[in-house]
Amino acid sequence: MSEEMKALREQLLRNDKNGYDTLDEAQLREMEAYCTDYKAFLNAGKTERLSARAAIAAAEERGFVQYKRGMALKAGDKVYTCNRGKGLMLAVIGKESLAEGAQIAAAHIDSPRLDLKPTPLYEDSEMAYFKTHYYGGIRKYQWVTIPLQLRGVVAKKDGSVVDVCIGEAGEPQLVITDLLPHLGGEQGRKPLNEAVPGETLNLLVGSRPIGDSEDKDRVKLHVMKRLHDKYGITESDFASAELEAVPAAEAVDIGIDGSMIGSYGHDDRVCGYAALRALLDIETPDKTAVCVLADKEEIGSMGVTGMQSAAFDAFMSDLCDGQNVPLKACFENAFCLSADVTAAYDPNFAEVYEKRNSAFVNYGMGLCKYTGARGKSGASDADAETVAYIRNLFDEAGVIWQIAELGKVDAGGGGTVAMYMANRNITTLDAGVPVLSMHAPFETVSKLDCYETYKGMKAVFQAEK
């Protein structure tokens, strides 16, 4: 190739590179340190409640205080508010008025899981089980025959709330059984999404009876006695409980080279942690920087702790009131990075991806101009100017990024909180970490992509305009 053609190619054509061809040794060390901290966050926060607690603890260590309505705030002040124990909003007050807008990163900290039903405990054939109702878009067959924990709370009539933790390392864990292949012929002929019906996702919780042999439900009684002895609860208390079955495995490095992280809950705690950590690591920004860690995204962002809730508006309104700024003025000048994961190209399932418009492992933070399904249904389609703004911001900050869609046009689709932020008249763009095996009990991400997403969040918070 002539030098002229080489120069023309470099001038006119994209030349995406594997991020490892760009990072130096110091950056690689920073990446590893960041990912070590992220794995600790994952292990501490297997539910939205636990994630919120871990985030609050980290924030308070860095000088954040709980916001009280009417609190006088000045540039550099760091505040947070917790939404019913399951969502979190944090802010670092900027030098400029909120009339100039805010720089927002909105992620979610709920993940697909199995929730206990209100009346979960039963006995059948002298084995005790918990009935579950799956939460979010799971592939049901992936949840059988893996070790599970039970985490959550039981709210009692007297107003007390009991934390429940069953199945940590070294303790007895729970499991959902599956059919042996010797008798699985009929099951094997069913479509994959029908082979394991939702009503069969029952947690095996005991088999040892107590009492006399003629008594009924002796195994169920034994399980309930164990729970009462440890937590002081009765069967009736399940009616006011939020108990979640989540994978027991901890976050681990993946690959002979240790270049990836495998864990439950990357979607979307990988972006939630990046946004949180970026906010904790900045000094006084020009514009007020806001991190949102929302609940209920996996089921449509509904409810008081979801992104459609007025809780976010109330928090921002309180901040604006302190500066005599109308909330609508802040929103119309604000920018939001809807921080959610995207699908990483998997060559084992190449038929559902459009390779030219897919996110690749180790190519950095994945921008998504739109999500949705088929004809962009349910999408927040960012305008060209918004994408250009982030391109320039990331390039100036040295962030490695790529742009992608979720998959082939008619192969499926997905959504994020972007539409709910955009509906508030906030300029919004989706961006996040590419994930392999998304929504599985054990997902995989690249360490490099995690680190670059953190850098991208930090660049948004530190933006001058």
Where do the language-model regions lie?
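N-terminal hydrophobic/helix-forming segments and targeting peptides
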Residues: 1-465
